[in-house]
Curated annotation (Swiss-Prot):
It is found in: Cytoplasm. Homotetramer. Forms an RuvA(8)-RuvB(12)-Holliday junction (HJ) complex. HJ DNA is sandwiched between 2 RuvA tetramers; dsDNA enters through RuvA and exits via RuvB. An RuvB hexamer assembles on each DNA strand where it exits the tetramer. Each RuvB hexamer is contacted by two RuvA subunits (via domain III) on 2 adjacent RuvB subunits; this complex drives branch migration. In the full resolvosome a probable DNA-RuvA(4)-RuvB(12)-RuvC(2) complex forms which resolves the HJ. Keywords: Cytoplasm, DNA damage, DNA recombination, DNA repair, DNA-binding. Belongs to the RuvA family. Residues 65-143 are annotated as: Domain II. GO terms for cellular component: cytoplasm; Holliday junction helicase complex; Holliday junction resolvase complex. This is Holliday junction branch migration complex subunit RuvA. Residues 144-154 are annotated as: Flexible linker. Gene3D superfamilies: 5' to 3' exonuclease, C-terminal subdomain, DNA helicase RuvA subunit, C-terminal domain, Nucleic acid-binding proteins. InterPro entries: DNA_helicase_Holl-junc_RuvA_I, Hlx-hairpin-Hlx_DNA-bd_motif, NA-bd_OB-fold, RuvA, RuvA_2-like, RuvA_C, RuvA_C_sf. Residues 154-205 are annotated as: Domain III. Residues 1-64 are annotated as: Domain I.
Length: 205
């Protein structure tokens, strides 16, 4: 089991990364909440990981915080929730927001995540309620996203990367493009910032 990687961020193509550890490149998929916190390509990075072994592939998922990884593990234990849906849920909602939804049994945000209908949201919240009794929300422990703008990137490539990342989460290409187009004052924003703002707009609308 690979539990943590520490190395150099070699590539960043949302939602995928490659981390170079002593000359070996590890490819990972990460939730957007982790993506927002990553350093620039070429800088040192540490991520907590979860390995999924399938017959046709070994898939590695990365997280900025241990609690993100624990949440991911709780989600994929649920009936009908695979890694893709778990990452979509975690990308649309910060950890503390998802925990509060579970505690309040509030489906309103969950149903805006691709692949989650009302019945599915209700079932997930019920199944997670007992598991989350020990999870207390704390801004200091759970706030994973800063409020400031992220580094500037090429406008055309940033928008294309953002659309691609949203599609990988399950949104339709038209929905993704529309969400990016709806962002005000987006000139010069990084793909990470575009993804963050578009997800916030779609989940909280």
């Amino acid at each position: 089991m690979i539990g943590r990687l520490r190395g150099t961020l070699a590539e960043k193509q949302p939602p995928h990364l490659i981390i170079d550890v002593n000359g070996v490149g590890y490819e990972l998929e990460v939730p957007m909440t982790t993506l927002y916190r990553l350093p620039k390509v070429g800088e040192a990075v540490t991520v907590h990981t979860h390995l999924v072994v399938r017959e046709d592939a070994h898939l590695l998922y990365g997280f900025a915080e241990k609690r993100e990884r624990e949440l991911f593990r709780e989600l994929i234990r649920l009936n009908g929730v695979g890694p893709k849906l778990a990452l979509a849920l975690m990308s649309g909602l910060e950890v503390d927001e998802l925990v509060r939804c579970v505690q309040a049994q509030d489906t309103s945000a969950l149903v805006r995540v691709p692949g989650v209908g009302k019945k599915t949201a209700e079932r997930l919240l019920v199944e997670l309620k007992d598991r989350f009794k020990a999870w207390e929300t704390s801004p200091a422990m759970f706030t994973l996203v800063s409020d400031g703008p992220l580094p500037v990137a090429s406008e055309s490539s940033a928008e294309a990367d953002a659309v691609s990342a949203l599609v990988s989460l399950g949104y339709k290409p038209q929905e993704a493009s529309k969400a990016i187009a709806a962002i005000k004052d987006k000139a010069g924003l990084s793909s990470e910032e575009l993804i963050r703002r578009s997800l916030k707009g779609m989940i909280t609308k």
